[in-house]
C-alpha cells in the first residue's frame, strides 16, 4: 500500500460520519502531531471523522519528519511550483477517504497548521467543488495561478508573537481573500507564538459549528 495512504485517524462519535476533517501538520512534523487536537474537539464535532495524513515527502532538512513541500528555497515562485507539483497527491488522499465514507468536498473540513495551512489554503482555492470550511493556524497564503473556489468560508488564526511565520502573513492572506470577495475571518491571539492554544481551538470549533453550507 502507498505509504501516503497510511496515517492516524479517529472515527466519529456518531455513525455514520457526516463530515470529514483533514488535519494538515507543519513542516518537519507528521500526522501524529495534529491528531492530538482531536480529543479537545471531538465532543463538539461528534459527526466528524478525523484524518491526519503525513506530509507527502520526507523532511529534507533533518533525518526525521515529513513535509508537504521543500522549504530549502523559500522564494514564492519556487513554492508555487512545488505546490503545483505536489497538490494532487494530497487531493488523492482526501478523495480516497471521502469515497470510503461516502462523503464529498461539501462535507469536508480542512484544518492546517503552519506549512499545513499553506497547502490547505492552496488546496481550498483550487477546488472545483467547495469544501465545507477551512481553518488555518499560523500559516501563509500562496496564491494559485487560478482560483476555482471563492465560496468556502475560511478562518485564519495567528499568534501575535509568532517568530516563525509572522502574523503579518495573516493580514496579507486576509487582504488577498478580500480582493476576491472570499468569506473569511482573521483572529490575532495575544501572547501567543508559533503554536495552537485553547483560545485558537475554541475559535476554530465555534467557526466550524456555525458554518452553514
From Swiss-Prot:
A Pfam entry, by short name: Abhydrolase_2
Active site, renumbered: 114 (charge relay system), 162 (charge relay system), 194 (charge relay system)
Enzyme Commission designation: 3.1.-.-
GO terms assigned for molecular function: hydrolase activity
Keyword Iron-sulfur: no
Enzyme class, broadest EC rank: hydrolase
Superkingdom of origin: Bacteria
Entry keywords, A to Z: Hydrolase
Protein name per the record: Uncharacterized hydrolase RBE_1307
Originating species: Rickettsia bellii (strain RML369-C)
Taxonomic classification: Bacteria, Pseudomonadati, Pseudomonadota, Alphaproteobacteria, Rickettsiales
Amino acid at each position: 500500500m502507498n505509504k501516503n495512504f497510511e496515517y492516524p485517524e479517529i472515527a466519529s462519535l456518531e455513525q455514520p460520519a457526516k463530515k470529514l476533517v483533514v488535519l494538515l501538520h507543519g513542516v518537519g512534523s507528521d500526522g501524529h502531531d495534529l491528531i492530538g487536537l482531536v480529543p479537545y474537539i471531538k465532543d463538539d464535532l461528534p459527526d466528524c471523522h478525523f484524518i491526519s495524513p503525513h506530509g507527502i515527502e520526507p523532511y529534507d532538512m533533518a533525518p526525521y519528519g515529513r513535509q508537504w513541500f521543500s522549504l530549502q528555497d523559500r522564494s514564492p515562485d519556487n513554492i508555487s511550483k512545488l505546490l503545483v507539483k505536489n497538490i494532487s497527491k494530497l487531493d488523492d488522499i482526501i478523495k480516497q477517504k471521502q469515497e470510503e465514507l461516502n462523503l464529498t468536498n461539501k462535507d469536508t473540513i480542512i484544518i492546517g497548521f503552519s506549512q499545513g495551512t499553506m497547502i490547505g489554503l492552496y488546496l481550498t482555492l483550487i477546488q472545483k467543488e467547495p469544501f465545507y470550511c477551512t481553518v488555518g493556524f499560523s500559516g501563509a497564503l500562496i496564491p494559485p495561478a487560478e482560483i476555482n473556489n471563492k465560496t468556502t468560508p475560511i478562518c485564519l488564526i495567528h499568534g501575535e508573537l509568532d517568530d516563525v511565520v509572522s502574523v503579518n502573513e495573516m493580514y496579507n492572506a486576509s487582504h488577498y481573500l478580500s480582493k476576491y470577495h472570499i468569506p473569511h475571518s482573521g483572529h490575532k491571539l495575544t501572547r501567543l507564538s508559533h503554536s495552537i492554544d485553547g483560545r485558537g481551538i475554541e475559535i476554530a470549533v465555534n467557526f466550524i459549528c456555525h458554518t452553514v453550507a
